Amino acid sequence: MNLHMHLNFFIRSLGVVLMMNLILSACSVVGIRALEEPAYQTRMQEGSFEIREYASYLVAEVFMEGEDFDEVSGDGFRILADYIFGNNLSRSSSVQMAGKAEAASENIAMTAPVQMDQGKKPNQWRMAFSLPSKWNLESAPFPNDQRVNLREIPPEQMVVLQFSGRMGTQDLEEREQELRQWAMKQGIAVVGSIRTARYDPPWTLPFLRKNEVQLKVMD
């Protein structure tokens, strides 16, 4: 009888877990988001254009070499995903191994968006995941992969264009031109290269995706 009760409890628990995974997957397909994002205040909005004031936030970033956006984005995502899914050393916990305490790894909650922009060198690209706000440089799990760098982004003002659909190279060039023209019309001086921001996983229906291109406002 006890075994039968345990089996029933296990089956019900497994069903709940599978149902929750199904609901979360379905939400991501239709563009429903529940991920933490860097904190900001909107200073101005005109249609799909915004001026935002970002507070400082922490990122895990990786630099890659390649000729274009599409070529390197997959590699960068895998490296950063490996870090947040446990290829790291926790600074707050340890496990007991063979009679001595050793540092444990720690899973990190996924956040949004995934950022990408050009690096300072030719054919260099940077991809970044923002980390949950509960962490800072001293407390965030330390990357095992030396390609992953933790960095605090200082407060910054950005002009932003939000759009749905795909983010191919040609799409981004057109959106960048739109954003630069809007900033010029507003009398806003911008600096640096375009930054892309993806808020949804690749399997989200394209017309429901939340994408952005961003440019930093000159100090």
Question: Can you say where each PLM-predicted feature lies in the sequence?
Answer:
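A solvent-exposed interaction/effector surface
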Residues: 2, 6-14, 18-219
